[in-house]
Structure formats: structure tokens, C-alpha cells
Amino acid sequence: MRFKHTYAIVLLVLFCMLVTSCKTNTSPPLHQQSMPLAPSHSLSSVKKPTILILIDSLMDKPLREAITQGRAPALAYLFAHGHYYPQVVSSFPTMSVTIDSTMLTGTYPNQHRIPGLSWYSTKEKRMIYYGMGPKEGLKIDQPQVLLDAVHHLNQTHLNRKTKTIHEEMAEMGKHSASINAIVWRGKTDHVLKIPRLISLSTPLPAELKVTGPALLSYATFAQLNPVQKEQRRIWRKYGMNDEFSAQEAAFLISTNKLPPLTITYFPENDMEVHKKGPATIEGIVKADQALQAVLNAFGSWEQAVNQARWVVMGDSGQSAVLPDRRTATIDLRSLLSPYRIAKIGQPIQRKDQLVVATNERMAYIYALDAHLSLTDMVKRLQKEERFDIIAVKEGQKTIVTAGKSNSTLSYRPGGAIKDDYDQTWTIYGDNKLLDLTIHNNHITYGKYPDALARLHGAMNSQEGRYAIVTVKPGYELVTESSPTHLGGSAHGSLHETDSLVPLLVVGTKTRPQTLRIVDLKDWLLRLANE
């Protein structure tokens, strides 16, 4: 029994690392003939369905390089038949759970209430992790992480007042599908199946009741193709891989069950980029192989672009991380050593003054002690020159400074100054801190796209008193046992290297109202109604 329990914990650690996508990928290449599929000539009663392929950490330059080298023929084919937008603004923090929540709800974290991959709940008085690194996995309650990731994220943490695209599709009387996406809440009842060894050896139940889209596929927990088993093995990350996603999408196509909207997530590129850096194209090549399998399910690629609309996109960029640990990493525990910081994996103690939640190149620092001065804490943080942004909230205002800076920027929503997205603001102080150019009461953003709204969204994403810090490109934040990506790359920050993603659209001449992920939802709903 002890062996079973230990093995189950190992399995939990492996799965809980999947959401972070920080583990090196060792999967074999995709075999396109692994599941024979009959060509589909009529896709149910849907006129022209939309298939959205989200490739984790897809960026413009490596995408173009993969196409130029002839190693991404499927993406090249769609590129030649569609419209390409190389710079779409992501959400903030630039972490998948927050970005996907923004895409599905059309709101920033101040409304959808998913602050990041890790955050502190003042209501539950505990840390929330939707994924973790291997060292963290030895200290954190893994069953709780799994429960948070597969159940609470969608069923309790994601704000019920912000409707997801799947919920709105259901209210319109239309079906939608989610394949391996992290955020998928909808209105149809489903049962997620927990692997038997894990449910027998941990407090986790054998089944979890959830609500999702009409068609829900989520790794080993729920699948559409009843005979697909190989891609759900432990060595294939329990189904959280590109091939599983592709085969599930191909199954819908071949059985004429494709709904008006299908959101399909290809996770593996993120792992390659984390390990090898932002210039690598190996993950894109693998994603392209998976995409080929989806296109082939139509019988030909020509039929694929004639019978469906295609949206291929990334969720965040990544910044290269320097190879030397001492230079690249900023240990928040050392900087904040005068304070008592809560220990990872342990209940919050009455004596604890701070909780730190790192999200790679960004962190939330929570003040638990009501007598602790955020101003004093910020002054201590300012001693570190590698901090790009340091922000706190005062009433309705966000106050911004930076490492080795003596100036501040204060702003709030509403006012006489307007930006490119028709958002209005009142701003005082040093505009250079957020690289803002203001002329004739109009804001032009620089290296922090949509900086005011995105930072405001994170600054108002949860209860409590806290600071937000991000680091300059080349650097990464660490605390107790948090993962690092030395010589590779990481994301999480507000900087453009983490924030800009490509968008490839085939089958429609329309585009989102603005080139921001927050505006994709309304556009996708319009496509579903055409």
C-alpha cells in the first residue's frame, strides 16, 4: 500500500506540472496514421464551424522561421490562405490560466478573478496552485493542486458573474467544444474520471461533477473518442499532449460532430521554449504535425479551409533567461528577509507577515500583517535594480515605481486621457515608468502593451493588500523551491516580449475589435452566429 501511495504521489506531481508546462518534453514524434479516420464531407448542420488552435507560447519570429525552413507545412498552408496579425496583446500576468480566463470571458482578472498560476486566497487562507515545479511538488499538497486545477479553477474560482464563451454559446442554443484547454466552464453536466490508482491512494474522489461545454475533452479525465487510450498513458502526460488534442479534434470532424466553435489546446511548444529559449522551433514543428492530422481529417487541406474557419494563435510570448543562476534569478526571500514569510506547503501561521506567490517573471507579495507598511516594503524592493515594475494599490489608484527609481506614476480609470483602445484614464507622475507617450490627451503604449488596463486588472484581481513585481527581460523571480529556466526562457511579466502573440485567421475577412486577447470572445461569438 505504501508503494501505491508513493506511486500515486509521483503521478500527481507529474500531472500537476502539466499546467505550468515547465517540464522538458520527452514525447515521441506524432504519427499521423495512429488513428485511421474517414474523410468528412458534411459537418452536421453547421454552416462553417470555427476551429481555434491555441499553441502555447507561440511567437511571431520562430513561427516565421519554422515556415521559412519548410518545417511547418500546415501552418504555411493556413498562412498562405488567411490573414496574419503578428502582435496581439495578451492578458497579465502572462500565465496560461489567466490568459485563457481572459479569452473565454472577454475580461481581465479584475472581473474573471483568476490572478495567476499561483496566488493567495484571503478567503480560504491558503495558497492556490494550478500547477507546480518538481521541487515544489515535494512540499505542496499535490491532491489539492490537482483538485484546484481540474475542478476549483473552473467551478468555484472563475467568477460566476463573468460568463464564458461556452456558457453564452449554450444560451444561444449552440454547441461548443473544448479540447485540452485549461479553462472550459459551460452549462452541460460532465463527470471527470480521476485515474483509479490516484483516487484509491489519495483523498481525491473517483469522479468529479463539473459543468462544461457540450463537448468536453480534458486529458485523461474526459475524452470524446472512446477508443483513444495510447495518448492518455502516463508517459504521454496523461493525454496533455498535442497528439491527443489533434486526435480528439479529428474525431469530431470524422464523425460529423464538429460544433460551431471548437477550442483546441496544443500544450507542448511551451515546454520546448522554456528549456531551449524563445528562438527554438522544435515545439512549433511538433504542433504543426498535430495540426496536419486535424487538417487531414477533412479529406484534404483544401476541403479543410473551405469547410471551416481557422484561428491559430499563441497565448503568451517568452523572454530569454540568462544562464547564470546568480545573475538571472532574484530571490524574493532574501530581499524581504526582515519580514516573516510564510513557508511553502505549510498552513499560514499567525506570526507570518508576508505570503509570496511567484509566477515566473512576476509575483504577488501579500501583506498579512495589518501593521505592515506597504510603502516600507516597496522601498526595500526598490533597492533591486532588476525589478521592471513595482506596483501597489491606494484606494482606486495604482501606484507604480521600479528598481533603483525615485519616481512614481499614479493612475486610475476614467478621466480626460484616452488610449488606443478607447479606455480613459487619469494619470500623474513619471510616464516613463510604463513607457507611456501622451500627446494631446492621447496615450501611445511602448514596451508594455495596454499597460494601464492590464496592470489595473491584476492589481484588482483579488482581495487583500499586496504588491505586484515584475522583472526585466533576462531575469526570473524565485522563492522557496520555485522552478527556474536558466538558459531557457520564461514569461509572466507585462513586458512586450512576454505579452505579444501571433494570430492567424483563415475563412473570414473579419477580425476582433482590437488586437487583444480580451476582445477575442465577442468576435468568436459573432463568427458562430454567421
Where are these regions (language model features)?
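His/Asp/Glu-rich, glycine-adjacent segments
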Residues: 26-28, 107-108, 113-274, 429-432, ...
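C-terminal motif of bacterial Sec signal peptides marking the signal peptidase cleavage site
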Residues: 18-21
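A long, amphipathic alpha-helix that forms part
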Residues: 239-253, 260-262, 269-310, 320, ...
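Short, structured active-site-proximal loop/turn typified by the sulfatase FGly-forming signature C/S-X-P-X-R
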Residues: 64-119, 177
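Active-site neighborhoods of enzymes that stabilize oxyanions during catalysis
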Residues: 161-163, 351-511, 521
